[in-house]
Amino acid sequence: MAKVKHNPDAAALIDKGISELEPFAQVICKRLRKIILSADPELIEDWKWGPNYYLNGMVCGYWGFKKHVSFVFFQGSLLKDKKKILLENPLNVHNRHIKFTDVKQIDDKVILEYLFEAIDNNRKGLKIIETKDKTIITPDDVVKAFKKAKVLAYFDSLAFSHRKEYVQWIESAKKEETR
């Protein structure tokens, strides 16, 4: 296996990060971490933007939020999802995730099945083939606001990923006045 550059402080960063989460999320993250690390001895625990597990590419990661923990499979759209538990974001063709709000929702055997499949896919080098269509539909009200503020040209000059993230962020607003 090729030498992979990873954060040598990953374990300590993960410990610290988990300790700062809400108590319910700490329990869930610790359980997921234990399951993930038991899945394959070659799986590398890493820290990117949070806990990340690597074997011939990123396999999975997790993180706690105010009311849930999101467990992400980075090439999740390749998984068969026999239990129909994976959620998707229509703006992300790769990832699939599971939301947990209570540790009792975690079925170790099911998580391991999904992990084994994801690890096997990475070992085989399977990848999502993205279409070349990099179109973002920017809501009309956002375009109007950008024109009024004279920043539309700047927005259009941003990289696709930045524009996509910005539109997702705006569309995720729970109230119209915060849009």
Predicted region positions:
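Charge-dense, helix-prone N-terminal extensions
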Residues: 1-179
